[in-house]
Amino acid sequence: MQPVIDKLIHEPARFQIMAQLYVVKSADFLFVMRQTDLTFGNLSSHISKLDNAKYVNVKKDFIGKKPSTMLKLTPKGRNAFDEYRKEMKNALKMP
């Protein structure tokens, strides 16, 4: 049986984003940008796709007068990443 790989997560930049968010409760947009070496626009585009899939929650707020964007995996996103990891492990097993 062929593994079912989530193509949304399989894209390298989105995989990096999901992996970063998987190990923390939440993260600031700029922190994720630095960790992944993505540009502001590129990260924003990938976050939009993950947000539309309900994998990531995006919360925009102000800290004092500074805008802040916090990112967090949703339960659906966490489950999808868990499943992706399982499918990749199965796909890479030697017969």
Can you annotate each of these PLM segments?
Residues 2, 19, 79-95:
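Amphipathic alpha-helical dimerization/coiled-coil segments
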Residues 4-42, 61-64, 70:
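N-terminal helix-turn-helix DNA-binding core of bacterial DNA-binding proteins
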Residues 30-32, 44, 70-71, 84-88, ...:
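Surface-exposed beta-strand edges and their flanking turn/coil or helix-capping segments
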Residues 47-48:
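Short, hydrophobic-biased segments on the C-terminal half of alpha helices
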Residues 54:
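Glycine-centered, phosphate/nucleic-acid-interacting loop/turn motifs that mediate DNA/RNA or nucleotide
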Residues 58:
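Short beta-strand "wing" residues that participate in macromolecule-binding interfaces
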Residues 63-82:
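Basic, amphipathic "hinge/linker" alpha-helix immediately C-terminal to the N-terminal HTH DNA-binding motif
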